[in-house]
Amino acid sequence: MLESLTVTPTAIIIMALVGLFTLVLPLGLGIFFWRKSKGRWRFFFIGCIIFPVFVLILERTAHSLLLYGAPGAVLQGNIWLYAFYAGLMAGVFEECGRWLAFKLSLRWSQGPGDALMYGAGHGGIEAILLAGMTMLSNITLALALNRGGLEAVEAMMGPLSETGLLA
């Protein structure tokens, strides 16, 4: 049964469209805000930098320090405590990143257009890195499955039992 896994062309096309949408929408919003509200591209790129630095680098580093060892065992042993921890960490790191971006860039701001550009950059890079890259990964796995089944995926990723994809 598992050897006959395939992904329909429609599903692959939808994944590609979602990936394309996550790339086009932020750029489209940036162009729209730039034209309509005279927002400046500097703020778009500040938003694009803040999200990966604070969430994907600093927050991930904090998780690696806190989730391994005794504190991590306590957090991971209680679903409610772990959910509280995850929400708190996400909020703290994203808001600290936004605060720093606003604190450093308010002196250059010339109105709400700049804030809109920052939001398009911050949310846009989040969409691209999380949804867009996920779609790219899903398409890669789907094509591997369609070309050679699980053997092709194992050749690409290693034994499935070690990757957590197969119980």
Regions found by a protein language model. Give the residues of each.
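Hydrophobic alpha-helical segments at protein termini of multi-pass membrane proteins
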Residues: 1-167
